[in-house]
Amino acid sequence: KAEAALRARRTSSLAFEGPADEAPAISKEFEYTPRHRLVLAGRGAIFRSMAQIGRATGYDVFALSPELSDLDAVRPVLNAEPVHLMSPNSSMPLDMLDAHSAFLTLFHDHDWEPALLRAALDTPARFIGSLGSRRTHEMRKETLRQMKVPEASISRLRGPIGLVPSLRDASSIAVSALAEIIAEFRN
């Protein structure tokens, strides 16, 4: 039962109990949680840094990008074949997202985000966030409203991602975003 739950990426527990005729009976329960997943959609230096830092932190990393050079750069740290995005408007199921997953959009050109965010918001992903300013985030949410995404789903979207605002270098932004994700998974 526990093994099947882990294969299905569900939290499971195992209990061990001593014989009932012994005093005192010894029992111990262990809870096992699937490894966290970090699913990244983006391009550029922040995308690359986030993949590397996510993997170094122990996350299973998945990547989607319109840039083949970015996918090639992060391929060594991925846990699955990267997905080459062909069009900003193409919808795709994000089947790899579950309750133990975080999904981030890491684009400076935000045209790629709406279809991806709509798909992500239809999943049980624990954390969904996007790069950008507060103004960009408000525009992003308005775009999702125009796409008829329910307000309850839109409220799940985090942005701008990161615990430290207004960072400029890719590695610092990645660390700041990952810290926010870690904090969410610890709650």
Locate each region found by the language model.
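Adenosine-phosphate binding glycine-rich loop
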Residues: 131-187
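Short amphipathic alpha-helix with an adjacent loop that forms part of the alpha/beta core around
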Residues: 88-99
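Short phosphate-binding/catalytic loops that engage adenosine nucleotides
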Residues: 59, 125, 149
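Short amphipathic alpha-helical segments
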Residues: 51-53, 75-76, 115-118, 141-143
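Residue-level detector of alpha-helix initiation sites
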Residues: 44-45, 110-111, 135
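ADP-ribose/adenylate-binding Rossmann-like module
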Residues: 102-103, 107-108, 118-143
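Short, charged, surface-exposed secondary-structure boundary motifs
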Residues: 72-76, 94-95, 138-141
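Segments forming oxygen-rich coordination pockets for charged ligands
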Residues: 1-84, 98-101, 180-185
